Amino acid sequence: MGPGIQPTSARPCSRTKHSRFALLAAALTARRVKQFTKQFRSRRMAEDILKLWQRQYHLPREDSDKRTLRERVHLYRPPRSDLGGIAVAVTVIALWATLFVYGLWFVKLPWALKVGETATSWATIAAVFFSLEFLYTGLFITTHDAMHGTIALRNRRLNDFLGQLAISLYAWFDYSVLHRKHWEHHNHTGEPRVDPDFHRGNPNLAVWFAQFMVSYMTLSQFLKIAVWSNLLLLAGAPLANQLLFMTAAPILSAFRLFYYGTYVPHHPEKGHTGAMPWQVSRTSSASRLQSFLTCYHFDLHWEHHRWPYAPWWELPKCRQIARGAALAPGPLPVPAAAAATAATAAAAAAATGSPAPASRAGSASSASAAASGFGSGHSGSVAAQPLSSLPLLSEGVKGLVEGAMELVAGGSSSGGGGEGGKPGAGEHGLLQRQRQLAPVGVMA
């Protein structure tokens, strides 16, 4: 064989080369088709989940007709399975039960020792108390998620059972009462005398907190607590331990929930007496860990109102989505008097050629834009009002003490204030479908 001639088996075969390219192209095409199919199924499944949610619950009034279902799903996709919600709820309840038993029967308080007993160290007592208080908060958050159907959306009875169980262990609240009032809060957020969680004309911390707590208490709740306490006494749980771990801890937890979940996000600015819809509620920019330790991400309150079908552990994800979509809380609307004053000042400034002073009235147009442009996806121009860092709890305690002094002095009257609407005015969804929305399968 001559020096420039290759054997037949060593010559490149154009047919083989083309077949390899064809196989590679087919593999890439199949992969793309598989990815597209997976994405389509995922989106379709998310749409089905949201449709199921909407048949049982209600989207916020401002969001009902502004976006299509596909657009809402594109922003946030609910969990595909109930397993995550059930696992989180059961874990919180189990951790609380373990620490509750330890605190009631194994912690020896120095002021309630029996003969021959050794007191538990103060460090251990403090660790148990604050850990249990945090888990009490988790119990309420679990109930809150149950009221939104985010524990077990596909099994309403199990969902409501876990919510009822958690709130019974918390403080024997009536789950059906909480369920009804919480959805009134979502459907009438910030409407004076209509929103059960909004202040009654006096936004003082102590006054608001007292009214908030009293509105959810019932006589049957106290009867259940009395029976439960006596059963624990018969089981050997000292009364002193009950007062510390079963009374003080949930009260502190209730204040934490109110402060970060109601007072901070829905507190009106000074001089504002009208409605405060959820679009202008404040939210937190704290880190994921800080937000969790604060109140199980309850400080991400704007995101919760925007996507009420998102479980608490996915609220940080909702915040990322909101930032990516240029969605943000809007500014409060300006009272008419303040707007007129600002307009006069602006006119005077224009006449003299001097720059107008900075004023909240300058954001009045953006406030109306927030109401009109939010649903249509143009809220990126709305000035955001996130909290760079939530106020310290000590500030809240200080305000609570000041408010208590005001109550003692007779300053708790909240006669006027606020533009009260008629109860039921602007009713939407929930109150018209009470039978469909009422919790089912709950404990008696």
Swiss-Prot record:
Keyword match Oxidoreductase: yes
The entry's keywords: Carotenoid biosynthesis, Oxidoreductase
Annotated Gly residues bias: 412-427
Keyword Oxidoreductase: yes
E.C. numbers: 1.14.99.64, 1.14.99.63
EC category name: oxidoreductase
Gene Ontology MF: a single term: oxidoreductase activity, acting on paired donors, with incorporation or reduction of molecular oxygen
Associated pathway: Carotenoid biosynthesis; astaxanthin biosynthesis
Reaction it catalyzes: all-trans-adonixanthin + 2 AH2 + 2 O2 = all-trans-(3S,3'S)-astaxanthin + 2 A + 3 H2O; all-trans-zeaxanthin + 2 AH2 + 2 O2 = all-trans-adonixanthin + 2 A + 3 H2O; echinenone + 2 AH2 + 2 O2 = canthaxanthin + 2 A + 3 H2O; all-trans-beta-carotene + 2 AH2 + 2 O2 = echinenone + 2 A + 3 H2O
Region of interest (Disordered), residue spans: 408-444
GO terms for biological process, alphabetical: carotenoid biosynthetic process
Role, per record: Involved in the biosynthesis of ketocarotenoids which are powerful anti-oxidative molecules. Catalyzes the conversion of zeaxanthin to astaxanthin via adonixanthin. Catalyzes the conversion of beta-carotene to canthaxanthin via echinenone.
Name recorded for this polypeptide: Zeaxanthin 4-ketolase
Organism of derivation: Chlamydomonas reinhardtii (Chlamydomonas smithii)
